[in-house]
Each structure stands twice: as structure tokens, then as C-alpha cells.
Amino acid sequence: MEVSLTAGAIGKIMNGEVTTEADMIPVLQVTDLKQIMAQQDPTRERFRMVLSDGTYLHQGMLGTDLNNLVKEGTLQPGSIVRLTRFVGDVIKGRRIVIVPQLEVLKQISDIIGHPVPGGKHNDQRGADSGIKFNTTEQQGSGIRQVNNIEPGRSNAAISPQVGGTGSSVPASTTPSTRAYSNPSSGNGVTRQDYARDPPTSYPHQPQPPPPMYANRGPVARNEAPPKIIPVNALSPYSGRWTIKARVTNKAALKQYSNPRGEGKVFNFDLLDADGGEIRVTCFNAVADQFYDQIVVGNLYLISRGSLRPAQKNFNHLRNDYEIMLDNASTIKQCYEEDAAIPRHQFHFRTIGDIESMENNCIVDVIGIVSSISPTVTITRKNGTATPKRSLQLKDMSGRSVEVTMWGDFCNAEGQRLQSLCDSGVFPVLAVKAGRISEFNGKTVSTIGSSQLFIDPDFVEAEKLKNWFEREGKSVPCISLSREFSGSGKVDVRKTISQIKDEKLGTSEKPDWITVSATILYLKFDNFCYTACPIMNGDRPCSKKVTDNGDGTWRCEKCDKSVDECDYRYILQLQIQDHTDLTCVTAFQEAGEEIMGISAKDLYYVKNEHKDEEKFEDIIRKVAFTKYNFKLKVKEETFSDEQRVKATVVKVDKLNYSADTRTMLGAMDKLRTRDANSLPINPEGSDYNADVVNTGIGSSGTRDPSSVQRRDFGLHAHQSGQSGNHYSGGGATTSCNVCGNSGHVSAKCPGATKPQEQGQYMGGSYRGTTGSYGGGLPRQHVGSY
């Protein structure tokens, strides 16, 4: 293959006409290579090389990330290379070409032409420009400065290209020689636009060298346009610099306090035309100055500011540095759009890849949302409450993973996803900068700098849509997450009979499940308790208070008395599904959702206003209403007896559309059981992952072993006047009135016989003073 060298390239580099690849991407020949050692770090290897354009020779320094090319023999004397990234800088009076990235066009070739050392360039001021390797000179302070400069990541070895599954929107994946300029920015700079995997840092900035203006008479002001350099060329050694980039993300302005005082801070992320990303941080007065000026999606010219090592615990961008702006920094908006700078850049990994990734890694992932849970409120260790919403994401790798949204994501993107799923649409979701965690399997969670894109318009999303419509709906997926968490803990759909059959709650940790059931009965003799209203931070104390007898209430925890107490729900409910019934307890938030009225208002209706009719009407509306109950099931010790207690942590009205999809999904998983999408249970009790368990085995017969179960719920001495009527149900259906099988108590022929006043009669109550709907006796409200 015949390769021509770029004529005159060395002369232009020596004269300062060409300082970076933005001005020219020359093809040169390496005529000599020599290994040198840095004086301050002898263990660090560097290679100095001599470059030729066929006429002149010039010294260059190879980036340390390219040392392997020399060691492998890919780069050697005689090799012809294309300098895809370089910086020409003056060190101790000599202009040195620092090459952090190059492309080897030909490994070995005869020396082309008869190159000689170049003449003295403008900046040299009479210094000798002869090409020779001098050990003393190589270890001088000037070279030491170069040796300190080391790109943070490996560059492309022979042919730069975007690695892995990374993508940008839009982005080119092949080199191009198209030049571009942005007239509105006032810089008039042309550069080559090609996409490649960029290094994180570059040693020196290509600034107009001051000596070029020497001997030209007095100059009052330098009116030269700013020299724009790539983001990845920035380093702590950069002096005057200007970058042109798009804001891809902006954090909120936050207040902070430390031993040095209080302050405020915000940051934003930048992306330039070469795919370089960097974070910019502003503090205090600088934050006030620039916060309103920065808008996500806009283009800016940013100059001045200091570079410091990136704090990788908080900064996920692929750059070893971040910018800190100060009072001397300038930000100028570019009002004319530059299509060469993408709006977003992704480095997608498949869900299958996540399985082998480490905990706390930051990942970009894209997939189809197959299901989503409602928003729940989680109380953190510091007492603050935060919303949480979970969804399942699947892709073409045959794997699915739980994605957990926190904070504002739940109400914005989360609500939109919920609406799409409820309407029968399976949207595409792209997650940028999600954090991997290993709690209950692999999960992906949002962090402060995460971004969510619903049905985005780029190639990966279109491929996923086509795959899902073509075959993805019926393809089984293995979940990397153990269970689908919808209420802050491991949360799976179960039947009431499974609570007893599977002995849920008896392990060291509680079980968190969802049960779709109907409220059969409510106990209302003590439906609320008096609570402390004193605020503890942003939450009320809510501990029980006692009446002092003088119109005040005392809280032992707060050690204070208050003039007025609060009232909070503590409801005892009996719920039933198609397999069994049980007792549960619902506290304040869940109680208000069920009753539709606050505990205080209901207390006043019953005890202050004595409005029995209104009270009964409220109760009547609640009875025989179906909900999705999210339960915490845990065994507790009461009076030296072990008892399993179920507490309602969240209650949602039944969404028939979503529930139908859940049923259909469960049926699909049953059909694809052989593909390991679900664990196979020969006893027919595999309701995990939203699979409905009817108690019928694969042979079509009921499993007699499922009839055996232990007692659950309240004991007789705690169950009101009639004791505990709730025997286990399991796979068989039996009547609680006559004890026979084949029908439920609500349809029992014996239930029509007159009973004692207020006795439970299989779904309705009948008293000697007459019967009425709603499942509660008029004279015995609050007793079983």
C-alpha cells in the first residue's frame, strides 16, 4: 500500500501554524524511537520519537498509553503513522510534539526522502534544533513536566473506534475529514470531525504562542478569536483554554454546611463534538452567577477555570478531571446550533452484561418496560421519607432486571411509564448513569445524576421495539433480581393460603408480599389511638399520649404535654381471596386510603357528633371492597406464644387493566416454565413473580398436602366476642359456617338460619333487630 506523507507538515508545526489535530491531521514517518525515564519517577517508561514529513525531522513524545505499540512491534522506526491527536508545545525553547493518539498506517517502510533536522522556528530564539537524544536533557525540568502528563485511559491502538456498545446521539463511528465552523461563536476555527474513543486528558492546550506577535509593533489588545480545544485535551497543565460543549445534565443548587462554614454548590456536565465529557462545579457566588445561565441542551463557550482530579465517588463521567469555575471564568452561549455536538452520549451495556458487573458500578442500559409498580414511600435511616417506584426492564439478551426510581423520578417519568403500561403499551426506557446494587440479586437504581429517556429516538430503541413486536413478547427472560420489589422490600404476589402453606414470616427477616383480596370485616371498637402531634424534624412524633385529666395530653417520649392530641388509625381487618381469609392490621396511611377519611374526623363523627348513621354509612362503603394489599408478614411473640402478624404497608385500589396483564404474564411464564423463567415446584405452589396459584397441580388434581397448614391470625382471646373464626383454607374450598367443602360461607345454605345478634354469617351479618348490608351488625360495631 502506497502512503504519501503530508508535505510541509513539519515546517508548519515548527512555525506554530499547526498546533493540534484541529488544524491538520498529518501523515508522518517515525525515523527513530528511544526509551527515556522520568527523573522523578524512574519506573515510568516514555518513548521519544523523531517524525519526518520526507523533508524535515522533528522531535515528538509518545503518550504512555501507546507504549504497548512499541513493545509489541507495531510501532517502530520506519512506521508510517497518522497523528489523530497531538499537541505542539514549547518546552525549554523547543517545540515538542506530544502524541497521545495515532493510527499506524504501515508498520515498516524504508525512510522516505532525505529528511534533515528542521531550521529554527519562531519560538526558539536561536536555540539549537538539531535532532539528537541527550540523556541529561531528557531528564530536565521541561521533560519532567511532559512525563507527568499521562492520559487516564487507553486509546485505540491501531484504528481508533468507538468501543463496546457505546453510542451517542447523534454520532459518527467512522473517520471523516469534514471540516466545520460555527460563525455564531466568533471563533472561525475549522476542525476535522470524526468520532473515536477519546482519552481522558491531554497534556497541553493549543494556544496561539505569544512569540508569533513579537516584533510587529505595539499591540493594545489581543483581538484573536479564542482557540477552541477538545474537552479531552484539558489537564491541570493547561493555561488559557476555551472549550465548546453542550450541557447534557444539570444538578440542583444545594446548600451545604461543613466546619469551614456554609455555602452552596451546583454542577453540570458537558459534551463536545469529539465525545469528550467533563463535569463543571460552581461554588457560592460563582454558583449564583451561572446557575440561571446554564440550560440543559444549550451550547456554550467556556473559558478559564481550574482543573482538579475528578471525585469518582460522585462523578461517573469518563474523564480523570473536572472543572472548577471561579470569578474570572467566562461562559458565553452559542445561539447557532452545531449538529456535530450530540445532545447525549450513551455507553449501553446489555442486561446480560450487568450480571457480571461489580456492585456500585455506573451503567447505561436500555430495555422494554414489562411491568411497573405504584409509588411507595420509604423512610430512610435519618427519618426522611422519599418516594420509590420499581419496574422490570428486559432486552434481547434474555435477561431482565429491576430498575428502582427514587425521588422526583417517581412522579415525572415514573407516572408517564405507569400510564403507558396501564394503556397496554410496553415503552422503551433508556437509563443513563444508573447504579448497580446487589441487594436481592442485581438491581439498577437511579442516582442524582441519572437521566431517564422514555421511547427515545435512536437506533437502539428502534431495534428493541422491532424485536419486542416480532418475538420479544413471548420470549422468556431470566430475572437478575430475585424478586420484583414494589413496596421498598422484596414484594411478590401471593395468595392468602400461601401465607400459611409456605410459612411466610417465620424466617429471620419479614416477608413482603402483595395480596389481592376483599375486605370482609372491620373491627371498630378501637379503630384509632391518641397520638403525639409534636414535630420531630419534618415528621410528627406519633407516639401514644395519655390524658392528664386536665384537658392536656402527655407524651412520654417527648416528655412534654400538649393541649390537643392527634388521632391515628390502627384498623383490624379481615380480608379474603379465592383461597382463604386472614386478619391484617392497617395503620395511619393505609387506614386513610381504605377509609377515605382521616382518623380524627371519623373519631369526631362517632364520639363527638354521635352521628351513628353517618358512621355506619362510612363503614358500609368500605366493606366488600377489593384492594391490592402490600403486606409485611413477620412472626412475633405475644404472651410467650409465637404468632404471625400481617401488617398493611400500602393499599391500592384494584386496577383491572393492570391486574389482567399480570394474570396474562403469569400464564405466559407458566407456559415457558421449562425455559427457567420460573422455579418449578412439583407441588403446584409456585406463585412467585406474579404467578397465580390456584392449588391445582400440573396433572389437574388438587394437592392434598396443601391442606395442612398452621394457625394464623388472632388467637381466640384476642378476637373479640366470637373468637377466631379463621381456619386455614389452602387449595381446598371449605365453608366456615357448616364446615363442608364445595362452597364458600357466603353461599352456605345454613347461613340463612337466624343467628344470635351480631354473629358473623359468612359474609353478611344478621341481628335480632334486623339485617343490613355492609357486613357489620348495627348493635355490635367493632366485635367479631
Curated annotation (Swiss-Prot):
Location of the region described as Disordered in the Swiss-Prot/TrEMBL record: 114-224, 678-707, 746-784
TM segment ranges: none
Cellular localisation: Nucleus
Chief site of localization: nucleus
Bias (Gly residues) ranges: 760-776
Gene Ontology terms describing biological process: DNA recombination; DNA repair; DNA replication
Zn finger residue spans: C4-type: 532-558
MF annotations from Gene Ontology: DNA binding; zinc ion binding
Compositional bias ranges of the Polar residues kind: 132-148, 167-190, 695-707
Superkingdom classification of source: Eukaryota
Keywords: DNA damage, DNA recombination, DNA repair, DNA replication, DNA-binding, Metal-binding, Nucleus, Zinc, Zinc-finger
Example of a GO cellular component annotation carried by this entry: nucleus
DNA damage keyword on record: yes
UniProt similarity note: Belongs to the replication factor A protein 1 family.
Function of the protein: Component of the replication protein A complex (RPA) required for DNA recombination, repair and replication. The activity of RPA is mediated by single-stranded DNA binding and protein interactions. Probably involved in repair of double-strand DNA breaks (DSBs) induced by genotoxic stresses.
NCBIfam families: rpa1
Subunit structure, interactors included: Heterotrimer of RPA1, RPA2 and RPA3 (canonical replication protein A complex).
PANTHER family noted in UniProt: REPLICATION FACTOR A 1, RFA1, REPLICATION PROTEIN A OB DOMAIN-CONTAINING PROTEIN
Name of this protein: Replication protein A 70 kDa DNA-binding subunit E
Gene for this chain: RPA1E
